[in-house]
Regions:
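Glycine-biased, small-residue-rich flexible motifs in mid-sequence functional cores and linkers
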Residues: 1-4, 73, 81-376
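Short, small/acidic-rich helices and loops at N termini and domain boundaries
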Residues: 1-85, 361-363, 368-370, 375-376
């Protein structure tokens, strides 16, 4: 632990000092300790408000920082500062990088691989969840680290897809690390910590304030070589992430959607505006920087199969009943078990055996209410 860690944490905790002001003060004074030692007049000349100056010159802020360090230890978390070697190189390049990153898990290990942000709507379709899980699973299995925001919908699906392939995933959250949001993602968060990292720029006890979530999006894109958008409405925060990615010189990818769906507006607009259309994992991998491809595959790109277009579904090793069910199911509209019983003209035991076999082969997924959907 660096000797001046409390100074960095304290500067990050001062109300009225965001990343832009903090970076300016550090460039002006050289270190957090020098900022705290500056005179009131000098700080006034920097344009700081009286209440911010008062907090900077109140010794209690350092007491709070030291208490924060004790809480970090209990949480098995760490803070990486802008001056630390462990600070992510790509993130350091962006405008207004966070001066301190709160981390649970192994961020360094997760970022040894090229990272891709996968984001989208919280209110997404079943198809969107299916696509997010499938693409994230395939990308993680080919060596990419999946970065998302731990939110409901597409974010959670992206994390789960990466975890299904035993891949690495990073959650960039809009709360302090002592708070899980949403609360039902506590188990998912712990799985991410065990297979990647959870990252925040906010002090430990920060609640899920609405303004925090668009604010953290620059970190989502800043950690990655590119951003993939899967379902986003016209006013979705995912479009903020895409804009930030463009500003940061990152690649922007999008999965096209149904033109009549509100959640397809974002990706369809981005594709029209020049984002790269994604249908399969290779569409992303082909855009990796050369050095990243060589690191992952030992060659410029992964070896191609005989056909460059792979079938999404293969009917190998399936029983006649399983094939029949797969033909009935779709990837976007769930089918209730009663509907399958009628459409398949199978008896109940045969239908249950077919569904069980398809689930074990990871070809379908059961949804709440005894409904089923085909996996991509």
């Amino acid at each position: 632990m660096r000797a001046d860690l409390a100074d960095w944490i304290a500067l990050n905790m001062v109300r009225g000092i965001g990343p832009r002001t903090a970076n300016h003060l550090l460039s002006r004074y050289g270190s957090p300790a020098s900022v705290f030692a500056a005179s009131r007049l000098a700080l006034q000349k920097e344009g700081l408000k009286p209440e911010t100056i008062q907090e900077l010159q109140d010794s209690s802020i350092l007491e709070k920082a030291n208490a924060e360090i004790e809480r970090l230890e209990k949480l098995n978390a760490q803070v990486i500062t802008l001056e630390d070697d462990e600070y992510p190189d790509l993130l350091r390049e962006i405008h207004d990088p966070p001066i301190a990153l709160y981390v649970r898990g192994d961020l360094q290990k997760a970022l040894e691989r090229p990272a891709l942000a996968v984001v989208g709507s919280r209110r997404c379709s079943t198809y969107g969840v299916n696509v997010a899980e499938s693409l994230s699973r395939d990308l993680a299995s080919h060596g990419l680290t999946i970065v998302s925001g731990l939110a409901r919908g597409i974010d959670a699906a992206a994390h789960r897809g990466a975890l299904e392939s035993s891949g690495q995933t990073i959650a960039v959250v809009g709360t302090g690390l002592e708070n899980t949001y949403p609360k039902e993602h506590k188990k998912l968060e712990e799985q991410i910590i065990a297979n990647g990292a959870v990252v925040s720029e906010f002090p430990l006890g920060t609640p899920p304030l609405p303004q925090n979530f668009p604010y953290r999006n620059r970190i989502l894109s800043g950690l990655c070589f590119g951003v993939l958008i899967i379902e986003a409405s016209e006013h979705s925060g995912s479009l903020i992430t895409a804009r930030l990615a463009y500003e940061q010189g990152r690649e922007v990818f999008a999965v096209p959607g149904n033109i009549t769906s509100q959640t397809s507006f974002g990706p369809n607009f981005l594709i029209k505006d020049g984002a790269k259309l994604v249908q399969i994992w290779r569409d992303v991998v082909d855009e990796l920087p050369r050095e990243a491809k060589e690191k992952l595959f030992g060659i410029e790109r992964p070896a191609a199969a005989k056909s460059s277009v792979q079938p999404i579904f293969e009917a190998v090793d399936l029983s006649d009943g399983e094939r029949k069910i797969l033909e009935i199911l779709s990837v976007d509209v769930p089918a209730h078990i009663d509907q399958l019983l009628i459409s398949s003209e199978m008896n109940s035991p045969d239908l249950m055996n077919a569904l069980l076999g398809l689930e074990m082969k990871d070809r379908i997924r059961q949804l709440p209410g005894k409904s089923f959907i085909k996996r991509i």
